[in-house]
């Protein structure tokens, strides 16, 4: 009989759950609604994917991440999970085929855009097949207090109520204040939910703020980017014009950069996003239209060229750095002009003809101004930046974290810069499978010998070849941490390979022999 732990190992290759995950899985399996607030990189998806494979019917994952659904589902399929997606990127024939297969019982997990819930074909499906669980990803989108309010999310409650039998409902988000959590509870009609908020602290992230006039920002940006070498990073700008100008600036210096914003056509956005995920470009310059749901683990820095509209947006965007747990830098460049730009957008949204009542729009504008106030406080505070963020999200914090620009004395900051430069020089992101990175996780298992590094190079190259054949990002095959563990432990059989963290049965069957050959050849030629 399958258990949560056996599913975790079989499909995802992990021996144990991260903090908070197992309790959520057990509550969902017991039929209790869940409201989980877990920071980026904490493993939210495991919390609903594992029970989805144990529950009898279909699990629906309602997500706004249309541009990423294909990759999200692709990663599940690579792990051996029967999954599909439904959104407006599919042709009519593709939608019809997907719905037919779903009615035939092909899928355990279906990702769906909220706008598709009312589609007649989808309505027929959910009336005919058992829906065991409805998962609401990025649940903060349901709240006007949230930074990504989407009116389409308000339809989810009625959709759940229309099902023949009420499924268990799980709501997941990376950032949610008390106001947002209240809205999620109310608008999804959660029934006595199990609520969990894991720590927002990301100890591996270094936070810094820099005041810079608009005329000074290009130089500040180039200084920051050039110090990063070949490391992957994201630069956020507040306007599409700023994105295009900044991308051209970086490209003019020979830096592989791409742009992403809503005014680009869908094909260009998709290509640029894929180029970043597949390591064909180093830096993505983007508006806040980019990043939600991006699961690229080796982003080493996030730079905000302009101040974001609120701390929820900032922390979620900055949190896209260092998802692999290794050191990463989050830098905010701000000026008074940024505040004026944000206020312009708030007023523009209030005056927009979007079908919402005037009083609702006025209240949304008031809440936006309140959030902007705290964002401005963060940008200018002389106190601990990490402490400011944690307290904003309702978490106790020490007076000093020792890992932000405000906590460090001038001499300490200079020393950190030197240490950071040395670390990054030794830990430069692998480009085209050239050089493996040393990291804290590597050091914890012992420094790699020269032989191990050569083997790791070969494993990276093999992963790149296999990812190219499968047309998936390299990290979907195996993570950097998994390959490092292979290089250290040198498994010589499938059974030994299954003892490596991140290697599940399905991936071992699909890729195991290809990596074992590399290890065997290296050991024999030693």
Segments predicted by a language model, with ranges:
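Accessory DNA-binding and partner-docking regions appended to nucleic-acid-acting proteins
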Residues: 1-4, 340-341, 346-361, 367-373, ...
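Helicase motor core with emphasis on the C-terminal RecA-like subdomain
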Residues: 2-11, 15-19, 23-45, 52-55, ...
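Short alpha-helical "packing" element that flanks the helix-turn-helix/winged-helix DNA-binding module
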Residues: 21-24, 375, 483
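Short alpha-helical segment immediately N-terminal to, or the first helix within
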Residues: 27, 304, 378, 485-486
